């Protein structure tokens, strides 16, 4: 299987599951390959044949983009190191959940969540602690008795019941056989990935740019947007330069001089914005030959400089889009 085949399989699964899909991101490097939405579920999907190809910088950007856009970041791949990814098993890379196409299919089309997670040392299952404790006490069985039956310590059984420790597959099967109940806790692949502090992320990047001689024109433009009242998250591996967010809106924000590459990126940003349900704006440092590209509004820097707050910017975007739609 090639990566191209893998991407087509993933797109097919998501489409069959009822997701609306963005165009594929064709930039390098890229933090995600496709955005997908179904109702309130938004996915930013990174495709890697070998999931070990995910690096920390890309994973970090995936997490922050997902947080800003109210979605989940996942990696879909085929192998890790020298072995193929197992079905119904999830893997973690830099706090990003990774899985294979079959697991993706089972989750979104068959409504069958994975139960097993891979970790150093083997495969593990999270236990429904309350169910285990209720079953044990229902049979008036002590911690010690149960521990001896499955070959673990009393403390380990206690940890299982407190949901403070995962168990091996063999142990879970033994426990389920003893009590005749299902104990494996389903894994929600849409869960939030770790703690995210997007504001600090944006600030830390800004701090590295505070030296006057290192500021680039696009950085100054992002500062202007920030002064309008937006929380600005700069990006390094996305089709847009930043995500700008306030209490009422989220804007995919491109910054560049006008050229043919800008038009291509504006098309891609438009597609992504339709899926993420955000605004899409390209700030042109200089003259722009066009006013908009599909849903992406082009704004010259001199026009941006005349805008005083976030609401005025939104009004400007809406007016320009309406003008484009009337043509």
Swiss-Prot record:
Domain of life: Archaea
Sequence ranges assigned to domain HTH cro/C1-type in this UniProt record: 132-190
Pfam families: HTH_3
Keyword entries, A-Z: DNA-binding, Transcription, Transcription regulation
InterPro entries linked: Arc_TR_HTH (IPR020886), Cro/C1-type_HTH (IPR001387), Lambda_DNA-bd_dom_sf (IPR010982)
SUPFAM superfamilies: lambda repressor-like DNA-binding domains (SSF47413)
GO molecular function terms attached to this record: DNA binding; DNA-binding transcription factor activity
DNA-binding region: 143-162
Protein name, entry field: Putative HTH-type transcriptional regulatory protein Mbar_A2318
Organism: Methanosarcina barkeri (strain Fusaro / DSM 804)
């Amino acid at each position: 299987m090639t990566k191209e085949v893998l991407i087509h399989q993933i797109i097919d699964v998501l489409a069959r599951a009822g997701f609306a899909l963005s165009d594929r991101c064709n930039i390098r490097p890229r933090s995600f390959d496709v955005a997908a939405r179904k109702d309130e579920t938004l996915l930013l999907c990174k495709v890697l044949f070998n999931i070990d190809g995910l690096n920390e910088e890309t994973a970090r950007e995936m997490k922050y983009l997902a947080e800003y856009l109210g979605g989940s970041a996942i990696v879909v791949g085929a192998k890790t190191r020298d072995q193929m990814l197992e079905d119904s098993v999830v893997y973690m890379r830099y706090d990003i959940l990774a899985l294979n196409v079959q697991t993706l299919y089972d989750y979104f089309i068959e409504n069958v969540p994975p139960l097993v997670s891979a970790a150093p040392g083997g495969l593990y299952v999270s236990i429904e602690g309350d169910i285990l404790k209720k079953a044990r006490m229902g049979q008036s069985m002590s911690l010690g008795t149960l521990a001896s039956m499955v070959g673990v310590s009393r403390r380990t059984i206690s940890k299982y019941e407190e949901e403070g420790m995962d168990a091996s597959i063999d142990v879970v099967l033994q426990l389920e056989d003893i009590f005749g109940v299902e104990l494996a806790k389903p894994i929600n692949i849409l869960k939030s990935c770790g703690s995210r502090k997007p504001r600090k992320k944006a600030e830390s990047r800004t701090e590295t740019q505070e030296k006057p001689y290192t500021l680039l024109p696009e950085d100054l433009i992002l500062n202007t947007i920030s002064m309008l009242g937006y929380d600005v998250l700069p990006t390094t591996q996305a089709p847009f330069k930043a995500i700008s967010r306030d209490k009422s809106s989220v804007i995919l924000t491109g910054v560049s001089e006008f050229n043919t590459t800008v038009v291509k990126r504006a098309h891609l940003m438009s597609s992504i914005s339709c899926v993420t349900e955000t605004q899409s704006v390209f700030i042109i440092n200089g003259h722009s030959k066009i006013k908009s590209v599909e849903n992406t509004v082009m704004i010259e820097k001199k026009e941006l400089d005349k805008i005083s707050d976030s609401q005025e910017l939104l009004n400007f975007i809406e007016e320009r889009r309406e003008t484009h739609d009337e043509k």
